């Protein structure tokens, strides 16, 4: 059984002092999601309960009209690339990486272009051989999101041996794969194939909460929900209820992230010519918050600095971010922006020159749970031709 620190913020209270946000009386609702899902008791309603918009005490990272203040800066370390001389290590299978997870002080990366999961230590040294993620009936699966499974369910099998999957990955070909090295150290087996329905499904992100699997279907513009035996569950609406600022029909969910007792759904704008793909642009993006039963809580943030957003992680308060803040990666402009617990923009992560950190093709983010000073990332470079894994480390403090 994995402990909370290993499972991270996806399946329990966060080690980042990010408060559990389910207030008294705010039941998760009907359906198979257990009321005792949060491993830590949810406290009384806090200012960072997403259903309560209060005075979080927002403090922009840079305020030209305020007093001088200390700001933490960050530096980029390039750990692994598919190209030589681009990073400390080279791995030809690291092409078009998306999701990233940290488990057992190791990095696990889903690579879309090579249909693999690659595994490294925190310095970028490759550990296992590349893990195949492929549907035998197809030439490719194109894995995107990856999630740690802490439940003991969501089985994977090689036909002889069956175990709970350690990781689940989803793909842009509408499939889900489950991996356990005891079943096969180099194969992640197909466990769900929605292409068999005859419809097009493009899964760009996934989340596991209790014994429920949530999939962000970008093409169908919906969240699909399954139980731990991969049976479809209905009755989870996932309808954005912000009538004052409705999400246009040209958008679809590109990722879903479980933080505390809530699900954050990230929306990207579809390419009108190729609706399986997203397009980038300033203000292209929405993020909304839902209960685990799919009922709408509130809009977190809209447009503004969003530019084809994808990953969301808790921001480390130890590095000067307001309590309950979140960091959001932009694939479009390569920035990592901070938002307070009410969804108000705080500012970008900065380099030592006081300028925004920019990572070309930025996609996934994963904080190092035992070290608040480091965040790992994935990036797809040169239009899916190349890939990069790196870390962003706390650098020096500067004053504005």
UniProtKB/Swiss-Prot annotation:
Keyword tags: Virion
Family, as annotated: Belongs to the mimivirus R640 family.
Domain of life: Viruses
Coiled-coil ranges per UniProt: none
Subcellular location: Virion
Alphabetical list of Gene3D superfamilies matching this protein: YVTN repeat-like/Quinoprotein amine dehydrogenase
GO cellular component: virion component
Designated name of the protein: Uncharacterized protein R648
Entry keyword annotation includes Ribosomal protein: no
């Amino acid at each position: 059984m994995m402990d909370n620190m290993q499972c991270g913020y996806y399946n329990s209270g966060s080690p980042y002092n990010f408060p559990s946000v389910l207030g008294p009386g705010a039941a998760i609702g009907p359906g198979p999601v257990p009321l005792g899902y949060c491993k830590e008791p949810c406290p009384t309603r806090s200012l960072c309960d997403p259903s309560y918009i209060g005075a979080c005490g927002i403090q922009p990272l840079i305020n030209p009209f305020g007093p001088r203040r200390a700001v933490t800066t960050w530096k980029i370390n390039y750990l692994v690339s598919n190209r030589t001389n681009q990073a400390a290590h080279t791995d030809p299978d690291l092409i078009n990486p998306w999701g990233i997870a940290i488990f057992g002080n190791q990095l696990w990366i889903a690579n879309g272009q090579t249909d693999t999961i690659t595994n490294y230590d925190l310095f970028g040294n490759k550990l296992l051989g590349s893990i195949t993620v492929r549907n035998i009936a197809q030439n490719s699966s194109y894995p995107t999101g990856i999630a740690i499974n802490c439940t003991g369910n969501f089985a994977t099998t090689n036909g002889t041996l069956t175990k709970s999957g350690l990781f689940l990955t989803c793909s842009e070909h509408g499939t889900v794969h489950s991996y356990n090295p005891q079943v096969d150290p180099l194969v992640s087996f197909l466990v769900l194939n929605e292409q068999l329905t005859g419809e097009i499904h493009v899964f760009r992100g996934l989340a596991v909460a209790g014994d429920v699997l949530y999939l962000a279907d970008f093409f169908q513009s919906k969240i699909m929900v399954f139980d731990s035996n991969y049976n479809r569950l209905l009755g989870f609406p996932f309808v954005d209820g912000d009538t004052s600022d409705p999400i246009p029909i040209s958008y679809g969910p590109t990722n879903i992230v479980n933080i505390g007792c809530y699900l954050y759904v990230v929306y990207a704008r579809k390419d009108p010519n190729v609706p399986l793909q997203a397009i980038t642009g300033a203000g292209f993006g929405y993020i909304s918050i839902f209960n685990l039963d799919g009922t709408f809580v509130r809009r977190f943030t809209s447009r503004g600095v969003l530019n084809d957003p994808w990953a969301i992680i808790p921001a480390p308060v130890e590095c000067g971010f307001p309590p309950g803040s979140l960091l959001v990666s932009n694939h479009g402009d390569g920035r990592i922006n901070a938002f307070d617990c009410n969804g108000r923009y705080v500012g970008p992560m900065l380099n030592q020159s006081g300028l925004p950190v920019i990572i070309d093709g930025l996609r996934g983010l994963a904080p190092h749970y035992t070290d608040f000073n480091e965040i790992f990332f994935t990036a797809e470079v040169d239009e899916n031709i190349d890939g990069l894994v790196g870390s962003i480390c706390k650098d020096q403090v500067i004053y504005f």
